[in-house]
A protein has these predicted regions:
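HTH-adjacent hinge/linker in prokaryotic transcriptional regulators
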Residues: 1-32, 43-52, 63-69
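Acidic/glycine-enriched edge-of-secondary-structure segments
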Residues: 3, 29-35, 156-166
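Short Gly/Thr/Asp-enriched flexible loops that form oxyanion-binding sites at enzyme active sites
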Residues: 38-50, 135-144
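Glycine-rich beta-strand-to-loop/alpha-helix junction loops that act as flexible
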Residues: 33-38, 192
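Secondary-structure boundary/capping motif
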Residues: 28-30, 53, 121-122, 185
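Short, flexible active-site-adjacent loop segments at beta-strand->alpha-helix junctions, enriched
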Residues: 37, 61-63
Length: 238
């Protein structure tokens, strides 16, 4: 199914992610998480006290000043409650003015949480379209149009990518940066809905995703996109 048109499919995505997470988590693991609607849905399938594991859940993105249910801090606390583990909180906004970033990153409580996130055994993160995330960050219409015109299709960790995974634009955001992902043993990307196909493609092309949990809407769209690219290559060769 397609999360964009069938609400039940987003639930299925949450169920599949929860099942996989329970399968791979080991006692002693550090689980790093981001926020967003998809990960909030995943947290729904970890009822309080349903498990008993020695894990630590860490939010690795600051807050975007929106619905508290989809903040990384809330997702981390809810997952930890369901897993029977511990959690830390990242008391910081997602985006800060460039001149204030270093000062904020040197604040001991923020620095310690981000350092713990960098040592994660597993990272679970959502993915957004470039337009959706620009709107959530409060970009004005002109800036959004400029971003789209420059080829940006997806966003993760404050970076906006084109379909080949090239960085088009990056924000001064608090939390994990792209280079940190290379050192994390298992990076799980979760995102569904046909509208996110290009965004998923961008993250896969970047090469930092070990496991991608998605839906039929994205999978079918990606297969058709690959077909189009192959067709173009064949035309070019002939």
């Amino acid at each position: 199914g397609d999360s964009d048109t069938e609400p039940g499919v987003k639930q299925d995505l949450g169920v599949a992610t929860a099942r996989y997470l329970r399968h791979v988590l080991r006692d002693g693991d550090i689980l790093a998480v981001t926020g967003g609607t998809t990960l909030a849905q995943v947290a729904d399938f970890f009822p309080e006290g349903s498990d008993s594991r020695q894990v630590t859940v860490v939010p690795v993105r600051g807050g975007l000043g929106e619905d508290v249910k989809i903040q990384a801090n809330t997702v981390a606390a809810r997952l930890a409650g369901g897993l029977g583990g511990r959690y830390r909180l990242l008391h910081a906004p997602e985006d800060v003015l460039p001149g204030h970033l270093n000062q904020m990153l040197n604040e001991p409580r923020i620095r310690d949480v981000i350092a713990l996130g960098r040592r994660a055994d597993i990272l679970l993160h959502g993915i957004g379209t470039a337009e959706e995330m620009a709107k959530r960050r409060g970009f004005d219409e002109a800036a959004i149009m400029e971003l789209i015109a420059s080829g940006a299709v997806g966003e993760a960790f404050g970076y906006y990518f084109d379909a080949k995974g090239n960085i088009i634009y990056s924000t001064t955001s608090v939390g994990l940066r792209l280079a940190d992902l290379e050192k994390i043993p298992l990076v799980i990307t979760v995102g569904g809905g046909r509208s996110k196909a290009w965004a998923v493609q961008a993250v896969l092309a970047r090469g930092y995703c070990d496991v991608c949990i998605t839906d039929e809407g994205v999978a079918r769209r990606l297969m058709s996109l690959e077909g189009i690219e192959k067709y173009k290559e064949d035309l070019h060769e002939h």
